UniProtKB/Swiss-Prot annotation:
Entry GO CC: mitochondrial matrix
GO molecular function: transferase activity
SUPFAM superfamilies, A to Z: Folate-binding domain (SSF103025)
Family: Belongs to the GcvT family. CAF17/IBA57 subfamily.
A family per Pfam: Beta-barrel_CAF17_C
Cellular localisation: Mitochondrion matrix
Protein name per UniProt: Iron-sulfur cluster assembly factor IBA57 homolog, mitochondrial
Keywords recorded for this protein, A-Z: Mitochondrion, Transit peptide
Domain of life: Eukaryota
BP-aspect Gene Ontology terms: iron-sulfur cluster assembly
Methyltransferase is among the record's keywords: no
Transit peptide, start-end: 1-15
Length: 406
């Protein structure tokens, strides 16, 4: 069964008045971050298996935007998929008028920040490559709202950085340099923090690992992030599992993109979703979902490659693709999959064409690499809780966890 995740933020704030001086946005994330020499040295000495199982990593590919003002909550409420009246951190998305994702975001808000500012305020965490576009989007809708909207430095005395932790590493983050924390609602065992920029680590007696291990964690759990994995203005929020990540409040009022989102919820049919996948080159049989992660796996499938069924000889069929590669590191990755064609899950009354034992693959430089979708128990549990046929929408796993804490 799925692990229950807790959404209660680690609410710690000891900062002085936020410096709202604008700075240049950092470079777009390319899948790997370049760490200082000392940290790269640690990475070369650390066990790959250990780093995959548990670790902390800075996320230089994420930027922060500061939003504050007497009507900031009302303003943001009309632009995002979640309830912006909250006073604890949450996951959400900005949509365009057609209901397509502009960007996925974390909204960092906590009581101490609001008290410090004297009104509702937050940090909007977004893919660094989309920060400027999001700034323009916010200013375009500002109208007569009295708001402060500014980039947040990632360096210097007043800078703030985004960090991630996974496995047991979060137990080492003990009120030591972090500003706020959140148990990542997108998947079990993932955690997120804001920390002062001058911190080289957020965990006592624990050094950071390369950011690619954070990406591996996301891929293992099937968590897409940022513009490379959610192409702006074309990705639907349900296809990116934003609904299953507690990123959509289906009961909230009007916001941009709501019409298609609610219509999809009422029809109850989402035929494609991003799932974790494992790769296997050569030999008979499907890829083993329990096989160790191998970052050096080759040949490496590339984003955009079509996934097709394999015939009895192991060759790719010439029919309609059943999916498409979204991202990959080694033998793990993400793929947009036609649910009823590539898994045993059903999303419609008529069902799909999936048969037990069906195998899938991609062509990488003339070689067939097998692709195995991975469907976690917790993923199925979330999907059935939210989209189960004939059921009323149940309380989210986040709401249940919060009630237990209260």
């Amino acid at each position: 069964m799925a692990s229950r995740i807790l959404a209660a933020p680690v609410q710690r704030c000891r900062r002085s008045q936020h410096d709202r001086r604008p700075i240049a946005v950092s470079a777009t994330h390319n899948g790997f971050s370049r760490l200082p020499t000392a940290l790269r040295s640690y990475f070369t000495e650390a066990s790959t298996a250990q780093a995959i199982a548990s670790g902390i990593a800075p996320l230089p590919h994420r930027s922060l935007i500061f939003l504050s003002g007497p009507t900031a909550s009302k303003f943001l409420h009309g632009l995002i998929t979640h309830d912006a009246t909250r006073v604890s951190p949450f996951y959400a998305a900005f949509l365009d008028a057609r209901g397509r994702v502009i960007c996925d975001v974390f909204i960092w808000v906590w009581p101490e920040l609001i008290a410090q500012q004297g009104h509702w305020a937050c940090y909007i965490e977004v893919d660094a490559g989309q920060a400027n576009a999001l700034m323009l989007h916010l200013k375009r809708h500002k109208l007569r709202h009295k708001l402060t909207i500014s980039h947040v430095p990632a360096e210097g005395r007043d800078g703030i950085k985004v960090w991630a932790a996974w496995g047991d590493a979060h137990k080492q983050v003990k009120d030591w340099g972090e500003i706020a924390g959140l148990q990542d609602p997108r998947a079990p065992g993932m955690y997120r923090y804001l920390a002062n920029a001058d911190r080289e680590t957020i965990a006592r007696d624990m050094q950071p690992v390369d950011t690619k291990f954070y990406d591996i964690q996301r891929y293992i759990h099937g968590v897409p992030e940022g513009s490379a994995e959610m192409p702006p203005y074309s990705t639907l929020p349900m296809e990116a599992n934003i609904d299953l990540s507690s990123g959509i409040d289906f009961k909230k009022g009007c916001y941009i993109g709501q019409e298609l989102t609610i219509r999809t919820k009422h029809t109850g049919v989402v035929r494609k979703r991003i799932l974790p996948v494992r790769f296997h080159a050569g030999g008979a049989g499907a890829a083993d979902p329990q096989a160790p992660v191998n970052p050096s796996f080759a040949p490496q499938p590339q984003p955009g490659m079509d996934i097709r069924t394999l015939d009895d000889t192991g060759a790719l069929s010439k029919g309609r693709p059943t999916g498409r590669i979204v991202a990959a590191i080694g033998n793990v990755g993400l793929a947009t999959c036609r649910i009823e064609n590539m898994t045993s899950m059903r999303v419609s009354t008529e069902g799909g064409f999936y048969k037990e034992g069906t195998q899938f693959g991609v062509d990488v430089d003339g070689q067939v690499v097998r692709v195995e979708p991975v469907v976690h128990d917790w993923f199925v549990e979330r999907k059935e809780a939210l989209w189960g046929r004939g059921e009323k929408m149940k309380k989210s796993w986040v709401e249940k966890a919060q009630e237990e804490l209260d």
